[in-house]
Protein backbone atom coordinates (compact mmCIF):
# COMPACT_ATOMS: atom_id res chain seq x y z
CA UNK A 1 0.00 0.00 0.00
CA UNK A 2 1.27 3.46 -0.85
CA UNK A 3 2.12 5.85 1.95
CA UNK A 4 0.85 9.41 1.68
CA UNK A 5 3.35 12.27 1.65
CA UNK A 6 3.24 15.84 0.47
CA UNK A 7 3.31 16.15 -3.32
CA UNK A 8 3.11 19.32 -5.40
CA UNK A 9 2.87 19.07 -9.17
CA UNK A 10 5.75 20.76 -11.01
CA UNK A 11 3.39 22.58 -13.39
CA UNK A 12 1.27 23.91 -10.55
CA UNK A 13 -1.90 22.03 -11.47
CA UNK A 14 -4.38 20.71 -8.95
CA UNK A 15 -4.40 16.93 -8.62
CA UNK A 16 -7.67 16.65 -10.55
CA UNK A 17 -6.78 19.23 -13.21
CA UNK A 18 -6.13 18.49 -16.89
CA UNK A 19 -3.31 20.07 -18.81
CA UNK A 20 -4.38 22.61 -21.42
CA UNK A 21 -6.21 20.74 -24.19
CA UNK A 22 -6.34 22.04 -27.76
CA UNK A 23 -8.02 20.32 -30.73
CA UNK A 24 -7.35 21.59 -34.25
CA UNK A 25 -9.49 20.15 -37.05
CA UNK A 26 -8.41 20.03 -40.68
CA UNK A 27 -4.74 19.76 -39.69
CA UNK A 28 -3.92 18.10 -43.02
CA UNK A 29 -5.99 18.03 -46.20
CA UNK A 30 -5.71 14.52 -47.67
CA UNK A 31 -7.63 12.35 -45.15
CA UNK A 32 -11.38 12.59 -44.68
CA UNK A 33 -10.69 13.56 -41.07
CA UNK A 34 -7.52 15.13 -39.68
CA UNK A 35 -6.89 16.51 -36.21
CA UNK A 36 -3.99 17.81 -34.16
CA UNK A 37 -4.65 17.26 -30.47
CA UNK A 38 -2.53 18.73 -27.72
CA UNK A 39 -2.48 17.68 -24.07
CA UNK A 40 -0.01 20.23 -22.75
CA UNK A 41 3.26 19.49 -24.56
CA UNK A 42 2.01 16.17 -25.95
CA UNK A 43 0.99 16.58 -29.58
CA UNK A 44 -0.59 13.84 -31.69
CA UNK A 45 -1.81 13.97 -35.27
CA UNK A 46 -4.92 11.82 -35.71
CA UNK A 47 -6.30 11.05 -39.16
CA UNK A 48 -9.27 9.03 -40.38
CA UNK A 49 -9.12 7.66 -43.92
CA UNK A 50 -11.91 5.87 -45.75
CA UNK A 51 -11.27 2.63 -47.62
CA UNK A 52 -13.92 0.95 -49.74
CA UNK A 53 -14.48 -2.65 -48.71
CA UNK A 54 -13.81 -4.52 -45.48
CA UNK A 55 -11.39 -7.19 -44.23
CA UNK A 56 -12.06 -10.78 -45.26
CA UNK A 57 -13.71 -11.69 -41.95
CA UNK A 58 -16.29 -8.92 -42.49
CA UNK A 59 -17.14 -9.57 -46.13
CA UNK A 60 -20.81 -10.05 -46.99
CA UNK A 61 -21.78 -9.10 -43.43
CA UNK A 62 -23.28 -5.77 -44.44
CA UNK A 63 -21.17 -4.17 -41.72
CA UNK A 64 -18.17 -1.90 -41.84
CA UNK A 65 -14.93 -1.97 -39.88
CA UNK A 66 -12.61 0.40 -38.07
CA UNK A 67 -8.92 -0.23 -37.57
CA UNK A 68 -6.15 1.86 -36.01
CA UNK A 69 -2.40 2.29 -36.12
CA UNK A 70 -0.18 4.21 -33.69
CA UNK A 71 3.39 5.38 -34.12
CA UNK A 72 5.86 7.87 -32.71
CA UNK A 73 8.03 10.08 -34.88
CA UNK A 74 11.76 9.60 -34.24
CA UNK A 75 12.16 13.04 -32.67
CA UNK A 76 8.97 12.87 -30.59
CA UNK A 77 11.06 12.18 -27.49
CA UNK A 78 14.10 13.92 -26.02
CA UNK A 79 16.36 11.17 -27.36
CA UNK A 80 15.72 10.23 -30.98
CA UNK A 81 14.18 6.80 -31.48
CA UNK A 82 14.85 4.84 -34.63
CA UNK A 83 11.80 4.28 -36.81
CA UNK A 84 10.36 0.84 -36.14
CA UNK A 85 9.94 0.27 -39.86
CA UNK A 86 13.69 0.71 -40.30
CA UNK A 87 14.39 -1.67 -37.45
CA UNK A 88 12.28 -4.28 -39.21
CA UNK A 89 10.10 -4.99 -36.19
CA UNK A 90 7.14 -3.21 -34.63
CA UNK A 91 7.42 -3.12 -30.85
CA UNK A 92 4.89 -4.83 -28.63
CA UNK A 93 3.98 -1.49 -27.05
CA UNK A 94 3.07 -0.10 -30.46
CA UNK A 95 0.85 -3.08 -31.26
CA UNK A 96 -0.83 -2.82 -27.86
CA UNK A 97 -1.61 0.89 -28.23
CA UNK A 98 -2.84 0.43 -31.81
CA UNK A 99 -5.27 -2.24 -30.64
CA UNK A 100 -6.39 -0.07 -27.72
CA UNK A 101 -7.18 2.83 -30.04
CA UNK A 102 -9.09 0.54 -32.39
CA UNK A 103 -11.16 -0.99 -29.58
CA UNK A 104 -11.91 2.43 -28.13
CA UNK A 105 -13.04 3.97 -31.41
CA UNK A 106 -15.18 0.97 -32.33
CA UNK A 107 -17.19 1.86 -29.22
CA UNK A 108 -17.97 5.17 -30.94
CA UNK A 109 -19.29 3.84 -34.24
CA UNK A 110 -22.22 1.62 -35.20
CA UNK A 111 -20.59 -0.72 -37.71
CA UNK A 112 -23.98 -1.91 -38.94
CA UNK A 113 -24.67 1.62 -40.21
CA UNK A 114 -21.32 2.03 -41.95
CA UNK A 115 -21.93 -0.24 -44.91
CA UNK A 116 -19.06 -2.43 -46.09
CA UNK A 117 -16.52 0.36 -45.71
CA UNK A 118 -13.42 0.60 -43.55
CA UNK A 119 -12.24 3.62 -41.60
CA UNK A 120 -8.50 3.55 -40.91
CA UNK A 121 -7.37 5.63 -37.95
CA UNK A 122 -3.72 6.71 -37.89
CA UNK A 123 -2.27 8.34 -34.79
CA UNK A 124 1.25 9.75 -35.08
CA UNK A 125 2.91 11.25 -32.03
CA UNK A 126 4.70 14.46 -33.01
CA UNK A 127 5.85 15.27 -29.48
CA UNK A 128 5.58 13.02 -26.44
CA UNK A 129 5.20 14.28 -22.89
CA UNK A 130 3.02 11.58 -21.34
CA UNK A 131 -0.51 10.51 -22.20
CA UNK A 132 0.11 9.87 -25.89
CA UNK A 133 -2.35 6.99 -26.15
CA UNK A 134 -5.11 8.85 -24.32
CA UNK A 135 -4.58 11.96 -26.43
CA UNK A 136 -4.66 9.76 -29.54
CA UNK A 137 -8.02 8.24 -28.61
CA UNK A 138 -9.53 11.60 -27.75
CA UNK A 139 -8.33 13.28 -30.94
CA UNK A 140 -9.16 10.31 -33.13
CA UNK A 141 -12.84 10.56 -32.21
CA UNK A 142 -12.96 14.05 -33.71
CA UNK A 143 -11.18 12.85 -36.87
CA UNK A 144 -13.62 9.92 -37.03
CA UNK A 145 -16.60 12.27 -36.77
CA UNK A 146 -15.26 14.36 -39.65
CA UNK A 147 -14.65 11.25 -41.79
CA UNK A 148 -18.18 10.00 -41.21
CA UNK A 149 -19.55 13.42 -42.10
CA UNK A 150 -17.72 13.19 -45.45
CA UNK A 151 -19.10 9.69 -46.04
CA UNK A 152 -22.63 10.89 -45.36
CA UNK A 153 -22.23 13.89 -47.66
CA UNK A 154 -21.05 11.55 -50.41
CA UNK A 155 -23.97 9.19 -49.82
CA UNK A 156 -21.59 6.29 -49.13
CA UNK A 157 -22.98 5.19 -45.78
CA UNK A 158 -26.57 3.94 -45.51
CA UNK A 159 -27.23 5.16 -41.98
CA UNK A 160 -25.86 7.34 -39.18
CA UNK A 161 -22.87 5.40 -37.82
CA UNK A 162 -21.42 7.95 -35.41
CA UNK A 163 -22.14 7.27 -31.74
CA UNK A 164 -21.60 9.69 -28.82
CA UNK A 165 -18.03 10.65 -27.96
CA UNK A 166 -15.38 8.44 -26.44
CA UNK A 167 -12.47 10.06 -24.59
CA UNK A 168 -9.49 8.82 -22.62
CA UNK A 169 -7.20 10.12 -19.90
CA UNK A 170 -4.31 8.95 -17.75
CA UNK A 171 -4.38 8.93 -13.98
CA UNK A 172 -1.95 7.74 -11.36
CA UNK A 173 -0.89 7.63 -7.74
CA UNK A 174 2.12 9.76 -6.87
CA UNK A 175 3.26 9.72 -3.26
CA UNK A 176 -0.12 8.21 -2.44
CA UNK A 177 -2.09 11.00 -4.09
CA UNK A 178 -4.31 10.51 -7.16
CA UNK A 179 -3.30 12.77 -10.05
CA UNK A 180 -4.98 13.37 -13.40
CA UNK A 181 -3.35 13.55 -16.85
CA UNK A 182 0.26 12.72 -16.07
CA UNK A 183 3.08 14.36 -18.03
CA UNK A 184 6.23 12.32 -18.58
CA UNK A 185 8.02 13.47 -15.42
CA UNK A 186 5.07 12.31 -13.30
CA UNK A 187 4.44 9.15 -15.29
CA UNK A 188 7.95 7.82 -14.69
CA UNK A 189 7.71 8.30 -10.93
CA UNK A 190 4.10 7.18 -10.45
CA UNK A 191 3.50 4.34 -7.99
CA UNK A 192 0.38 3.36 -9.94
CA UNK A 193 -0.35 4.21 -13.57
CA UNK A 194 -3.75 3.90 -15.25
CA UNK A 195 -5.40 4.75 -18.56
CA UNK A 196 -9.17 5.10 -18.57
CA UNK A 197 -11.40 5.20 -21.67
CA UNK A 198 -15.01 6.31 -21.20
CA UNK A 199 -18.11 7.15 -23.21
CA UNK A 200 -20.00 10.41 -22.92
CA UNK A 201 -22.61 8.67 -20.76
CA UNK A 202 -19.94 7.66 -18.23
CA UNK A 203 -19.60 4.00 -19.19
CA UNK A 204 -16.16 2.43 -19.29
CA UNK A 205 -14.70 1.20 -22.57
CA UNK A 206 -11.39 0.11 -21.07
CA UNK A 207 -9.34 0.46 -17.91
CA UNK A 208 -5.61 -0.27 -17.93
CA UNK A 209 -4.05 -0.12 -14.49
CA UNK A 210 -0.74 -1.29 -13.07
CA UNK A 211 0.94 -1.06 -9.70
CA UNK A 212 4.30 0.03 -11.08
CA UNK A 213 6.08 0.30 -7.74
CA UNK A 214 3.51 -0.79 -5.18
CA UNK A 215 0.03 -2.15 -4.60
CA UNK A 216 -3.09 -0.01 -4.26
CA UNK A 217 -6.37 -0.29 -2.40
CA UNK A 218 -9.96 -0.34 -3.63
CA UNK A 219 -10.42 3.10 -2.09
CA UNK A 220 -7.45 4.45 -4.05
CA UNK A 221 -8.78 2.82 -7.22
CA UNK A 222 -12.10 4.57 -6.69
CA UNK A 223 -10.34 7.90 -6.18
CA UNK A 224 -8.43 7.47 -9.44
CA UNK A 225 -11.56 6.49 -11.34
CA UNK A 226 -13.41 9.50 -9.93
CA UNK A 227 -10.86 11.99 -11.22
CA UNK A 228 -10.52 10.07 -14.50
CA UNK A 229 -14.28 10.42 -14.98
CA UNK A 230 -13.98 14.15 -14.35
CA UNK A 231 -11.20 14.39 -16.92
CA UNK A 232 -13.13 12.42 -19.53
CA UNK A 233 -16.17 14.66 -19.06
CA UNK A 234 -14.00 17.70 -19.74
CA UNK A 235 -12.48 16.04 -22.80
CA UNK A 236 -15.90 15.17 -24.21
CA UNK A 237 -16.84 18.83 -23.79
CA UNK A 238 -13.68 19.80 -25.72
CA UNK A 239 -14.48 17.28 -28.47
CA UNK A 240 -18.02 18.58 -28.88
CA UNK A 241 -16.82 22.17 -28.85
CA UNK A 242 -14.30 21.37 -31.60
CA UNK A 243 -17.04 19.70 -33.66
CA UNK A 244 -19.51 22.50 -33.01
CA UNK A 245 -22.11 20.21 -31.46
Swiss-Prot record:
Q: Which InterPro entries match?
A: ExoRNase_PH_dom1, ExoRNase_PH_dom2, ExoRNase_PH_dom2_sf, PNPase/RNase_PH_dom_sf, Ribosomal_Su5_D2-typ_SF, RNase_PH, RNase_PH_bac-type, RNase_PH_CS
| Any one GO biological process | rRNA catabolic process
Pfam families in alphabetical order: RNase_PH (PF01138), RNase_PH_C (PF03725)
- Coiled coil (UniProt feature): none
The chemistry this enzyme catalyses reads:
tRNA(n+1) + phosphate = tRNA(n) + a ribonucleoside 5'-diphosphate
For the protein in the UniProt heading, the enzyme class is transferase
Gene3D superfamilies found in the cross-reference section: GHMP Kinase, N-terminal domain (3.30.230.70)
Q: Which domain of life is it from?
A: Bacteria
In its UniProt entry, what is this protein called?
Ribonuclease PH
What lineage does UniProt assign to this protein's organism?
Bacteria, Bacillati, Actinomycetota, Actinomycetes, Mycobacteriales
